[in-house]
Amino acid sequence: MTEHLPASQVSFDENALIAERRAKLLALRAQGVAYPNDVKREHYAADVQAAFANVETWTAETLEASSHRVRMAGRLMAKRLMGKASFAQIQDESGRIQLLIQSNVLGEDSYAAFKVLDVGDIIAVEGGLTRTRTGELSVKVNVLRLLTKALRPLPDKWHGLTDVEQRYRQRYVDLIVTPESREIFIKRSKIIRALRTWLDARLFLEVETPMMHYIPGGAAAKPFVTYHNALDLELYLRVAPELYLKRLVVGGLERVYEINRNFRNEGVSTRHNPEFTMLELYEAYSTYHEVMDLAETMIRDTAQSVLGTTQVIWDGAQIDLGPIFRRWRMDEAVCHHNPEMSVAECTDRDALLLHCERLKIKVKSSYGWGRLLLSIFEATVEHTLIQPTFITDHPVEISPLARESDIESGYTDRFELFINGKEIANGFSELNDPEEQAMRFQKQVEAKEGGDDEAMYYDADYIRALEYGMAPTGGLGIGVDRLVMLLTGSTSIRDVLLFPYMRPER
């Protein structure tokens, strides 16, 4: 049975270890070799392991008889002293490999120096290859140098990084000791690369738009406020790039996309971080139906490219991205999950208020029927959408930038994609009527004056751009962090952000 030390004892022991390591560093400084910077690495652990993986071909005898030598560097992750011969493991970005260190091969002085190394130190080694009695490929070290002295000990294999908050605060330690965490961020990079490759192949142009806005817009969200000293001007960190991207469509860039950070001054949860990554794209002469097709295919192809499968497990749910995604009108979905409601009632504010009261849903007196319908949807439907589902045809009231439906007044050509009860994407046929957009902006201004701090501002320059004429356009926004959560099976957005927002340590 492993005895776990109390936190105070662990802290005391850690301080003692740090003091011991500082003393070793002081001795190295006295020798003038504290932090050498003249090492050339030529080989990586995973490459060496793969090249000599065949145990029958590469026996200990054939390896030692060969002329193969490696020059490697990495972090010392384990050390086992055994008299005149010892074993160790180093870890580089590709993986780990075992070291066989013998005093008669390395030399007595170097062997003595190895014995006082600490786990966590970064070292360089050279040597031939061999295989142990258990069949493990090993570097038979004849040159060893300390490159970086680690002053703080890594979490031991018993305690580890059990404090989740510490994992987020000290991601540098988490990446060293948690292979699963490292793999998530490698996959994240591959997912973003796959999205770019998919869009580039379809002749979308990647662009960059401002991160600081004079007028925040493009989403119903509370912005962060900053200040430009030289211009004596209040600015806002962007909540979305939408209005700038659509200006580019006006300018004739008919297929554009941007993958970048957005900032929203809102709550923090397992699904929300104040800064997050979004993919937004716009395609001229496209409708929301075609954008749904695009989103579905892109997500499916990205999963297949990165994972080799379209089936994933997310928070205990088996998700299949292979079949055609369901498409379901918001009012029909609400009525399906609330049989006491009729589709006709979905546009009746008084009826919706009664249903909200019955369902104990808190609403504001300023809500119109659109917001009330959304409130019922969020309370009774959203969490049930496990398999990929497009919820379509949102009310105009909650969609100030979307084109109103030609078929049904009060609704828009808009969709949101839900998977396992979480919103992954949002898109619509863009509103390109400048006069209608101006009226919608004015209603947003009135809502803001009425206390809605997430309502949009009036953007006169965007209206001016629309007055030059924007082609019929479809737009899409995908929450990249949530997509990464889906494809890595992560249950918290903090698990897929290298440095998630945390309150400062006291």
Curated annotation (Swiss-Prot):
GO molecular function: ATP binding; lysine-tRNA ligase activity; magnesium ion binding; tRNA binding
InterPro entries: Aa-tRNA-synt_II, aa-tRNA-synth_II, aa-tRNA-synth_II/BPL/LPL, Lys-tRNA-ligase_II, Lys-tRNA-ligase_II_N, Lys-tRNA-synth_II_C, NA-bd_OB-fold, NA-bd_OB_tRNA
Subcellular location(s) per record: Cytoplasm
PROSITE patterns, sorted: AA_TRNA_LIGASE_II
Disulfide bond annotation, renumbered to this chain: none
GO BP terms in the entry: lysyl-tRNA aminoacylation
Binding site for Mg(2+) 2: E423
UniProt cofactor note: Binds 3 Mg(2+) ions per subunit.
Reactions that this protein is recorded to catalyse: tRNA(Lys) + L-lysine + ATP = L-lysyl-tRNA(Lys) + AMP + diphosphate
Cited Pfam families: tRNA-synt_2, tRNA_anti-codon
Record has Repeat as a keyword: no
GO annotations of cellular component type: cytosol
Annotated residues for binding of Mg(2+) 1: E416, E423
EC number: 6.1.1.6
Cofactor requirements of the protein: Mg(2+)
Keyword vocabulary terms for this entry: Aminoacyl-tRNA synthetase, ATP-binding, Cytoplasm, Ligase, Magnesium, Metal-binding, Nucleotide-binding, Protein biosynthesis
Enzyme class: ligase
Family recorded in the similarity comment: Belongs to the class-II aminoacyl-tRNA synthetase family.
Subunit structure: Homodimer.
Protein name, entry field: Lysine--tRNA ligase
